[in-house]
Curated annotation (Swiss-Prot):
Keywords: Glycoprotein, Receptor, Repeat, Secreted, Signal
UniProt lineage: Eukaryota, Viridiplantae, Streptophyta, Embryophyta, Tracheophyta
Protein name per the record: Putative cysteine-rich receptor-like protein kinase At4g11521
Annotated glycosylation sites: N34, N102, N119, N247
Subcellular location: Secreted
Nuclease listed as a keyword: no
Claim: Glycoprotein is one of the keywords in the record: yes
Transmembrane segments: none
Similarity annotation: Belongs to the protein kinase superfamily. Ser/Thr protein kinase family. CRK subfamily.
Predominant location: secreted
Residue span(s) of domain Gnk2-homologous: 24-122, 128-241
Superkingdom of this protein's organism: Eukaryota
């Protein structure tokens, strides 16, 4: 396992709406505007949406030669419709161009797609930083002991499913899972986790488990949230999102609390 932690200037840009979480993260040096690296970046980002959809939702490539070589990986979550995948990638690349005007490394991981580029090859590297939690600060409004038990079990189950190596699936469909659990009679927890497919199963599991722990340190008890890292991502909420739950059967609501009748003398 190769673990890299980057202590570099980081520029984070966040956008949160009711059903969308987007984070553009830019770091690790600068390039000259209108120089060769800039032209390479614009060239590959401009056509990325069509290439991802044409390659079954996953695409990786390089462009140029050192010192202006660029490495890129992009994907949509399994099952995303081509039009939605293309729109997500296009919005992501536009956001990177705006938010990272001359940074040599950047990534963005909205709900149903991700884009990551660098001037250094990162395939298979366990790069954990920069990372960022995003959450709704409103309190969950239920008993935290009950919530923690259900949420922890759901996250553990989802991570186990995602981190298994799915040899029968295409490369871009590895390391992904979405699942649900009943919280109350009227509330359901929705979770989605994903890693990029270039890392090992063990590294994927490590990243997701570490991300869950870090998320709980900052955001325990909040209504919904996400935690983004360069090669793994978690999100949960109390409503379905990203089209990830269309084929998942909702669980039965928990049984009502039973009341023990009084004992008569």
């Amino acid at each position: 396992m190769m673990l890299n932690t980057l202590f570099l200037p980081i520029f984070l840009f966040f956008l949160i709406t009711f059903d969308y979480v987007s984070t553009q993260t830019c770091f690790n040096g600068y390039f000259k505007p209108n120089g060769t690296y800039d032209l390479n970046r614009r060239r590959i980002l401009s056509s990325l949406a069509s290439k991802v959809t044409a390659h079954n939702g996953f695409y990786s490539s390089t462009i140029g030669q050192n010192p202006n070589q660029m490495f890129i990986i992009s994907m949509c979550i399994p099952g995303t419709k081509p039009e939605r995948c293309s729109d997500c990638i296009k919005g992501s690349t536009d956001g990177l161009l705006r938010s990272c005007p001359n940074q040599t490394v950047g990534y963005v991981w909205p709900d149903c797609c991700m884009v990551r580029y660098s001037n250094i090859s990162f395939s298979g590297s366990l790069i954990m930083e920069p990372s960022q939690p995003v959450s709704d600060p409103a309190p969950i409004g239920v008993d935290l002991t009950l919530f923690d038990r259900i949420w922890d079990e759901l996250m553990s189950r989802t991570i186990t499913t995602a981190s298994r190596t799915h040899g029968s699936l295409s490369f871009g469909h590895k390391y992904y899972a979405a699942d649900v659990a009943s919280l109350t009679t009227f509330q359901t927890i929705y979770t989605m986790v994903q890693c990029t497919p270039d890392v090992s199963s063990g590294d994927c599991e490590f990243c997701l488990k570490r991300t869950v722990l870090d998320y709980k340190k900052c955001c325990r008890g909040h209504i919904g949230g996400a935690f983004v890292r360069p090669f793994c991502f978690i999100r949960w909420d109390l409503y379905p999102f990203a089209g990830a739950f269309e084929n998942i059967t909702l669980p039965s609501p928990p049984p009502p609390l039973s009341l023990t009748p009084p004992v008569s003398n």
